């Protein structure tokens, strides 16, 4: 099932709904992973504004989780390839989230912006101490993220506080899908209509159950939490006016334009 978080232009009202194959949104009262009911109202997709699928209680990020991306980042830093020995998790900031079709604002002092197309896991149940066999039971669904990064800041700063978390640096959407075949999924990232990255979405060093199981040994996972699963391949430098599309088969396409502040 495809779930969309939307608002109605001019009214300020925001709600969730299901999206069908005819681009009709069937509105609910409540949230998808908890108690809810259909209101009887329907909207055309073209008549609503798509919002960020969820503003999470906690925003997790897997980081280096695909081998080609690891090799690229280590080469840029002048280091030998160091493959992570275990599934360690990081954090991102919710202030950076923007929705499908919203602009990514390049800060005035930023000099090297890149995209990172990622699969995003949405948690649907409170969970602690999960085995890998149990881990997928807490997953509600999936969406798409673009982990926008300023590479100069990433290398120069002690943390990723601005390189990864500046306002608008985390586009996510356009919706959540509960039925998703990771084994068949392909991730393609295009800049101005030209494919720049293409990889098997499931070709991760550490898969989703491994991450969720390891995380839940020390952290309680809550409904609405999100886990970004990393990216692969090379990302070109982006400039003012570039439009980036992250397409994951079975999920859809996340589209954002980059503009200089």
Question: Where do the PLM segments sit?
Answer:
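A generic local secondary-structure boundary/capping motif
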Residues: 49-51, 77-79, 104-113, 127-134, ...
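Structural signature of FAD isoalloxazine-binding scaffolds in flavoprotein oxidoreductases
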Residues: 78-99, 115, 245-249
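Ligand-binding beta-strand-loop-alpha-helix segment within the catalytic cores
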Residues: 100-102, 109, 117-119
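Residues embedded in well-ordered beta-strands
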Residues: 118-122, 143, 188
